[in-house]
Amino acid sequence: MGMFNWLASAGMTGFPQLAEAGGYSLNFDILEANLVNLVIVIGLLIYFGRGFLGESLVKRREAIETAISEAEANQEKAAATLAEEQEKLAQAQAEAKKILANAQTNASKAKEQILAEAKTEIQRIKDAGSQDTSASQERAIAEIRQRVTAMALEKVEADLKNQLGNNESAQRKLVDQSIALLGGNS
């Protein structure tokens, strides 16, 4: 209330004719009137807006803190999931290497076995064919070679199908590795 009285008395001293008349009138000095209005508006904003603004800031701060904590939790969860998936990938790659090594070992054993059987078969045919002419011997040897090759391929294919038949991912990895060994892109 003291501020109002001060402003009123200051206004009266600026206009002595109004003070003598004993009343108030409009103040036409724009700068002086704006200053008074600004002081009143700022005072009202501070008085009434303090609670609203403080409450808004508290709510906003809580929302930001919640968002940050959720983001941190999501980041930790994602890091844990990534570690698990990398571990699973490493295990799958190790298993694929084992399967490939076993397949190669079995294929080489099958090849050696087929070659040994072919040698004994060739020897048997040579012994039996010594009575035939040399032309019939050559035909028989060529035929045996063809059969042995066909048998070897069938045996290797059967062994690979037995080992890799139910494991599509191992088949896919074996094919990709074979293509890579040949210089292709998978």
UniProtKB/Swiss-Prot annotation:
It is a single-pass membrane protein. One of its GO terms (molecular function) is proton-transporting ATP synthase activity, rotational mechanism. It is found in: Cellular thylakoid membrane. Keywords: ATP synthesis, CF(0), Hydrogen ion transport, Ion transport, Membrane, Thylakoid, Transmembrane, Transmembrane helix, Transport. The chain crosses the membrane at residues 28-48. GO terms for cellular component: plasma membrane-derived thylakoid membrane; proton-transporting ATP synthase complex. Its main location: membrane. InterPro entries: ATP_synth_b/b'su_bac/chlpt. It holds the Pfam family ATP-synt_B. CDD domains: ATP-synt_Fo_b. It comes from the Bacteria. F(1)F(0) ATP synthase produces ATP from ADP in the presence of a proton or sodium gradient. F-type ATPases consist of two structural domains, F(1) containing the extramembraneous catalytic core and F(0) containing the membrane proton channel, linked together by a central stalk and a peripheral stalk. During catalysis, ATP synthesis in the catalytic domain of F(1) is coupled via a rotary mechanism of the central stalk subunits to proton translocation. Component of the F(0) channel, it forms part of the peripheral stalk, linking F(1) to F(0). F-type ATPases have 2 components, F(1) - the catalytic core - and F(0) - the membrane proton channel. F(1) has five subunits: alpha(3), beta(3), gamma(1), delta(1), epsilon(1). F(0) has four main subunits: a(1), b(1), b'(1) and c(10-14). The alpha and beta chains form an alternating ring which encloses part of the gamma chain. F(1) is attached to F(0) by a central stalk formed by the gamma and epsilon chains, while a peripheral stalk is formed by the delta, b and b' chains. Belongs to the ATPase B chain family. This is ATP synthase subunit b 1.
